[in-house]
Every structure is written in C-alpha cells, then in structure tokens.
Amino acid sequence: MKDCILITGGAGFIGSAISHLLHAEDNRTIVAIDNLHPQVHPKQRRPDDLHQDVELIVADICEPETWSRFMQEWRPSLVIHLAAETGTGQSLSEASRHTHVNVTGTARMLDAFAAAQHVPQRIVLTSSRAVYGEGVWQRPDGDLFQPGQRSKSMLDDAQWDFPNAVALPFCADITPPNPTSVYGATKLAQEHIINAWALSFGADVAILRLQNVYGAGQSLDNPYTGIVSLFSRLAKSGLSIPLYEDGLMRRDFVYISDVARAVLAASKEQAAVGRVYDIGFGSASTIKDLADEVARHYGAPAPHVCGKYRNGDVRHAGCDVAASLALGWKPEVTMAEGVARLCDWIDVRLSEGAV
C-alpha cells in the first residue's frame, strides 16, 4: 500500500489550485477522486488547471466500489475533502442529490478507512459560510438575535432586511451555526460526521468555512455557482448585469489563490488541529459594488435592479478572519485586483475558444 495525499473533488476549481501548491511543497503522490460531473465539467475530460502530475481517478465518492478500489492501492496520510454539491438555491429543489453527495459520500469515505483499518494523520474539510445561515444580527440597544430564514412573504413584499438591526460578521468561535439552505445543512452535517469519526479513531481534523470563492479557473458553465464569473461574461457581452433584491446584499469575496494557501496551511500547521476557521477577505462588499467593478472593467452598461430574488439566499455574509491569522495566513488579493485577474483570464479563455 502506498502513501498519498487524497483530494476528493480534486479536479474542481479549488482542488486544481491546491494541486499546484501541494506539488511544489510536498513530495507525496497526489491522488484526486472526482466524478467530473457535467454541470461542472461539461467537456467530461481532465481539466487543464489540474497539475499534470496528479493521479486522477474518475469515480463517484458515493459508490462503495470507488473506495474499495482506491484502498486496494492507497493509504492516504492527508485527506483534503472538497467533494460536494455546492448550489445553495439548487439544493432546495434537489435536496436528495445534495444530501447524497455531501453526507453519504463523506460517510462512504470514512467507512472505507475504517474497513481498511486505516486512519489518515489529518483530514482537512472545506466547509462553507452557509452553515451560519443569516448568522447573528444586532439591534440598536445591543441585543443580539438569530433571525433565521427570511420568509417567502418577506421576499415577495421586497422586505430584504430584518428591521432595525444589522448583521454581524461570522466568527466560528462565537456565531452559532443555523443553516437556512439544504446545502448549508449538509455542510454542517459533514463537519459533525468527520469530527465524530476522527475523535473516535484518532485523526487530526481541520475545518475551513469558506466565504464566496472566485478567481481564474472558476467554471464558466455552471449556472449555480460563481457569481463573479457570471457577471464577467454578461459585462463582456455588453449587457447590463441584473441585480437581485436591491443589489445591496453583502458577500465576502475571497480569491482562489488565498483559499488555496489557507487549505495548505490547514494541512500543515498544528494550530489548525481541532479548530474551525473562517476563510474570507475579512470585509464584505455589496453585490452592486461587485457588479459596478466588473461593468467598469468592460465598459458595460450600469447594472440594474431586476426585482428578483433567489430562494435560500441569505441577506448578508461576511466573516472575521482574525482567528485565521494563527495559521500564518492572511488574505492578499483585493476585490478590485481579483476581478481584474478573473476578467483577464476569461478574456484569454474566450479568445482561445476554451469555453
């Protein structure tokens, strides 16, 4: 049996970026398991962005046979668990699909390790800010409360915010998880399942709750993820970017290179063990700010409020990254710089006919 670094979902956006950092800093063989789902990989082939030395196994993590074949050859000392269905809105209409992949797929992996009597030294899970739902809000008198999910009647009446309150940044040490989407619920389940298993078997665990990840290498075909790439393609076509709600909902956009560095740190640093860290830029921007930045880059018409909303979306999401500094990590790429990098990459991809 051979040692390796296992990256589940390793042919995706984040996995491909991590593969290059790991290859540069670690001499272990890197094995990626990915089913190359057509929603993410419409061409059904190995992505160009995945490091050429990564051994790619095209298989479904939900199938026991995938793991029996894998464990016949490999004994991973490090597991980076990325594989997941990630559509927040889509998870409400395809709940069984998201639950099957995110929960059952995780359990299948752990069952395979247990059956082979193998315990990885460390498991790094990329979780999501979706586990917080709307998070914690504060009233003018200082009272804190968790508002829960915005109701359909609120959204239909264009009552976007909770009245007389402001949303506070998410912080893993103090913000209780309270998911408002099926996707968020499955990511929280992943955290609980992996923590319970690792505590029983003696594996180290590090969990990163990622904010909105974007950047060069992001899928330009998946309509359910990647708002920055979607905006970029619209603006490049000379179209006005439509803004849902009033365009003033906030998100914390973190560039892919910063996320890849955070995952690498979580795989190595002792400070990561047994902790949950929030990974974002540390300041939230409105969707309108983002759309304005993209429109300026392409000289596109000003974005417009379209009056629509998306089920499952939270109003505001941002995080406090102070705790994550313990990993020796901090975000570096500003939104303006990140948007410019992404748009330049999209221009090259389109000129090459790659999308």
Regions found by a protein language model. Give the residues of each.
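A conserved pocket-lining segment of Rossmann-fold NAD(P)-dependent short-chain dehydrogenase/reductase
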Residues: 91, 162-181, 205, 209-219, ...
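Structural element of the ATP-grasp superfamily
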Residues: 109, 194, 231, 323-324
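Short aromatic-enriched loop/helix-cap "lid" or pocket-rim segments at secondary-structure transitions
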Residues: 42-46, 134-139, 218-222, 290-291, ...
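Short, solvent-exposed loop/helix junctions and linker helices
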Residues: 8, 100-103, 183-184, 221, ...
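C-terminal substrate-binding subdomain of Rossmann-fold SDR/epimerase-dehydratase oxidoreductases
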Residues: 59, 165, 235-355
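N-terminal Rossmann-like NAD(P)+-binding domain of SDR-like oxidoreductases, especially those catalyzing
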Residues: 1-211
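Hydrophobic alpha-helix immediately C-terminal to the catalytic Tyr-X-X-X-Lys motif of short-chain
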Residues: 189, 193, 197, 227, ...
